[in-house]
Amino acid sequence: MESQQDFPHFLPGQEDGDSQRWGRGKRIGIIGGRGQMGRLFGRFFEAQGYQVVIADHDAGEGNEEIIRISDLVLFAVPLHETVSIIRDLIPYTRPEQLLMDLSSLKVGPIQEMLRSPSSIVGLHPMFGGSISSFAGQTMVACPARIDSREWSTMRQLFENQGMRIKECTPEKHDYMMSIIQVLFHVTTMVTGRVLRELAVDVAETMEFTSPSYRLEMNLLGRIFAQNPALYSAITQMNPFTRDVLDHLEAGLKRYKEWYNADDLSAFVSDFKRSAEHLGDFCGLAFEESSALLDFSVELARTRTEDRNQKTEGGNEKAEMRR
C-alpha cells in the first residue's frame, strides 16, 4: 500500500530547486473559491502575502483562466465533483505550477493530478470552514510529487499558523478515513434511520435522557445538520467502504444471533475482547468524556433556565396586555 512506487513523494534530483518558487507574493488560484473551505483558505493565503484569485459558479475568473494565470492552484470543490473538475483542467496545467486539493479523499484526486506535468500535494483539512483559528487543527498532507525543499517551505507555511501536519500516502489516508469517517458516519446515519423508522420523538427522549445519551444525540444531530451530499460522497467514494460495511453487517448479524439465542455471555465476552483491543485508550476516553458530559449537563441546565425565563417573560407581557 505504501510502496515508493505507488507514492512518489519527492522528485529525485531536484534538491537544489528554488524553494521560493511558490512563496509569498505568488498568485494562488482557488477553484471553488466561494465555498466555505475555499473562502477559509483564501483568507489564509491572503494573510500570508499571496495574491488570491478565485473561480466559482457565480464569481471570479473561469477555471481555465485560473490555471493559466496562477503559480499555485487549489481545488476546493465538492468531493463528488473533484476528480472530474481536475480531469477537465489537466490540459491547461504547466510544469512550474503546484496543484493542491482539499478533498476528503486522496487516491482519486491525486491520481488525476499526477496526469499533469505539475508538482502535486493533496491536502485534507480535518476541520470545517467555520473555525476561528488554525491553531491546534490537524491537516493531512500527501506530498505526491514535489521537491523536498519546496514541500518543506509549504509545510512550514501551514505549521506557522499552528496547524499540525500529518503526512501519509493517499492509500493510507483513504484507509484511515474509512475508519475515522465512514465507520462512524454510517453508524450515525443508520441510527438516524432507525429513529425515523421507529417514529421516535427525539424531544420526548430528552426528557428521559442521561448525560451520555444527550452528548451522543448532539453528535448525531450535528451530522444531520450538515451537507448530505458531502457525507454521502465520503461514504460512497472511499475505496475501503465495502470492507467497513461488510464488518458492520457481520457484527450486527452476530449480535442478532446472540439476542435470539438469549446468549448474554456472548455479549459479555465480545465486549471484553473489544475493551482489551482498545487497551489504555478506554481509561483516557472515560476521563475525557466525563469532562465533556459535565459540560454538556451544565450547558443543558443553562439553556433550560433561559427558556424558562423567556416563557415567564412572555406570560408577563400577555398578562399586561389583558
Where are these regions (language model features)?
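NAD(P)+-binding Rossmann beta1-loop-alpha1 motif at the extreme N-terminus of oxidoreductases
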Residues: 2-65
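Short, basic, low-complexity termini and linkers enriched in Ser/Thr/Gly/Pro
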Residues: 2-5, 9, 301-322
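Rossmann-like NAD(P)-binding element
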Residues: 65-90
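ADP-ribose/adenylate-binding Rossmann-like module
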Residues: 93-108
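Rossmann-fold dinucleotide-binding core
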Residues: 105-106, 112-177
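Active-site-proximal catalytic alpha-helix in oxidoreductases
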Residues: 173-202, 206-225
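Interdomain hinge/lid region at the active-site interface
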Residues: 204-285
